[in-house]
Amino acid sequence: MPTKIAVYPGSFDPITYGHLDIIDRALRIFDQVIVAVARNSAKSALFTTDERVDMIQRVLADNVRARVDTFDGLLIDYVLSQKATVIIRGLRAISDFEYEFQIAQMNRSISQDVETLFMMTSVPYGYLSSSIVKEVSSLNGPIDGLVPPLVRQALRDKFAGPDR
């Protein structure tokens, strides 16, 4: 039986428990999930690509069916190069859906061999985003329930200034 491979793309700047929830749930459906970190994201990143990959690899170290990789260029080209058939996208709100729907339609127009699977975030993570985590952390707020401990420490290190 062929291996069912899905790609979960994103900037993951940084990875949160919301992302990890989607990965865990996707692994219930697929044999392998590739967490694909965007190298040339339009977003301005706090962490370098290498730092993001390292954090994700460390967080997922015990899961042999999750693999971390990077990509640039068109996502659909990367997905096809990995012999994956599904793109996983997490949705928090209807506003996420409108944008993601447009991207999914564009990907579908390029290749009908790849489907996009939208997964609603679990209730505790419905509001969670990397941007919120970075903002709260930059203001020295509590992020314990939002990111794994090693990510929390990396954020503290990034935001530690001479006056902290």
From Swiss-Prot:
Assembly: Homohexamer.
Sites marked Transition state stabilizer: H19
Family stated for the protein in its record: Belongs to the bacterial CoaD family.
Gene name of this polypeptide: coaD
NCBIfam families reported in the protein's UniProt record: coaD_prev_kdtB, cyt_tran_rel
Entry's Gene Ontology cellular component terms: cytoplasm
Pfam families: CTP_transf_like (PF01467)
UniProt-annotated binding residues for substrate: S11, K43, L75, R89
Catalytic activity, as annotated: (R)-4'-phosphopantetheine + ATP + H(+) = 3'-dephospho-CoA + diphosphate
CDD domains hit by this protein: PPAT
Disulfide pairings: none
Function: Reversibly transfers an adenylyl group from ATP to 4'-phosphopantetheine, yielding dephospho-CoA (dPCoA) and pyrophosphate.
Keyword presence, Zinc: no
Subcellular location: Cytoplasm
InterPro entries: Cyt_trans-like, PPAT, Rossmann-like_a/b/a_fold
Gene Ontology molecular functions: ATP binding; pantetheine-phosphate adenylyltransferase activity
Organismal lineage: Bacteria, Pseudomonadati, Thermodesulfobacteriota, Desulfuromonadia, Geobacterales
Protein name: Phosphopantetheine adenylyltransferase
Keywords, ordered alphabetically: ATP-binding, Coenzyme A biosynthesis, Cytoplasm, Magnesium, Nucleotide-binding, Nucleotidyltransferase, Transferase
EC number: 2.7.7.3
Primary location group: cytoplasm
